[in-house]
Amino acid sequence: MSKSALLVLEDGTVFRGVSIGADGISVGEVVFNTSMTGYQEILTDPSYSQQIVTLTYPHIGNTGTTSEDEESSSIHAQGLVIRDLPLIASNFRSEQSLSDYLKSQNIVGIADIDTRKLTRILREKGAQNGCIVAGNNLDEALALAKAKEFPGLKGMDLAKEVTTKEAYQWKQGSWTLEGGLPEAKDDSELPYHVVAYDFGAKRNILRMLVDRGCRLTVVPAETSAEDVLALNPDGVFLSNGPGDPAPCTYAIEATKVFLEKGLPVFGICLGHQILALASGAKTVKMKFGHHGANHPVKDLDRNVVMITSQNHGFAADEATLPDNLRATHVSLFDGSLQGIHRTDKPAFSFQGHPEASPGPHDAAPLFDHFIELIKQHSA
């Protein structure tokens, strides 16, 4: 017999449904994601730390879960909100149902609520703090109090919370449906040594860098520029991650050093915002952010439109770009800045997710541009 659950927003709105995960209470910023597929990749994306994810597509869980689809070693989302959980997970790769997967990692989830209504609230009022309560004792007043107590993501430094504790090597390329996860590549196949800052890095980003010949040393978020330079890298990668970029002063200061040294730098998502801040621009908290796999972005240099995967609640403010930065990409949904390139250094970044997972691969050539900058710098 299914247990009950409720979701309470900080404005007092209450949604009652059924529990699809663990019993308990979970608090975070409630956001919506419009992706039709890729729910496991979304749940395990460290960028969703301290966020409760609402999936707008009505049927979630159809294909079960598999370890090959994880973007990190655990679920980072605070909770999951969906319309309907199918009774059957049909997929020859499936290892566990979505419900069992949530329970195994002690993640709270709720289904059978009006996710269209919830999404309209978040679009009109902006991302809100919320609380999911699941189990036998549902206390609306307690849930509302906890939602109001949550401080919100603005000013919250989460990169240092989700980062790796120790540096490690990554040499595994992309997996295939036929071959599964590949063995680590030999150093002879990886001519470029790249230091990747882990602010909450997704595995598929690392794989796509390896596919292009990068031997990766993944380092903790607070690693000093001095320690990175001692590794003699050919380039530096700034990963995606959760929270507000402004408090990440350790990363901003380190990036300034790499820019001064003229090292090739590539940033994605939070890494994009870090590069912007290190170059003198400012960032802002968005009303409800971009979360989905169908976001159109215009490449200003090539005058083409790309469909991209997005997941961010903060953005670099184009109005604050200094002369050493030029805008390279803009969102066709709201005109927000999506890409920048230094005019004086081999450094650039992209707000969306060129590695997709889930999502389209239109922006994947950005990885190739990073390799081009490394080659030019090494010549």
Curated annotation (Swiss-Prot):
Entry's family note: Belongs to the CarA family.
UniProt pathway annotation: Amino-acid biosynthesis; L-arginine biosynthesis; carbamoyl phosphate from bicarbonate: step 1/1; Pyrimidine metabolism; UMP biosynthesis via de novo pathway; (S)-dihydroorotate from bicarbonate: step 1/3
UniProt source species: Vibrio vulnificus (strain YJ016)
Keyword Nucleotide-binding found: yes
Protein's job: Small subunit of the glutamine-dependent carbamoyl phosphate synthetase (CPSase). CPSase catalyzes the formation of carbamoyl phosphate from the ammonia moiety of glutamine, carbonate, and phosphate donated by ATP, constituting the first step of 2 biosynthetic pathways, one leading to arginine and/or urea and the other to pyrimidine nucleotides. The small subunit (glutamine amidotransferase) binds and cleaves glutamine to supply the large subunit with the substrate ammonia.
GO MF: ATP binding; carbamoyl-phosphate synthase (glutamine-hydrolyzing) activity; glutaminase activity
Keyword vocabulary terms for this entry: Amino-acid biosynthesis, Arginine biosynthesis, ATP-binding, Glutamine amidotransferase, Ligase, Nucleotide-binding, Pyrimidine biosynthesis
The name this protein goes by in its record: Carbamoyl phosphate synthase small chain
Active-site residues, as the UniProt record annotates them: 269, 353, 355
Domain Glutamine amidotransferase type-1: 193-379
Segments of this protein annotated with the region CPSase: 1-189
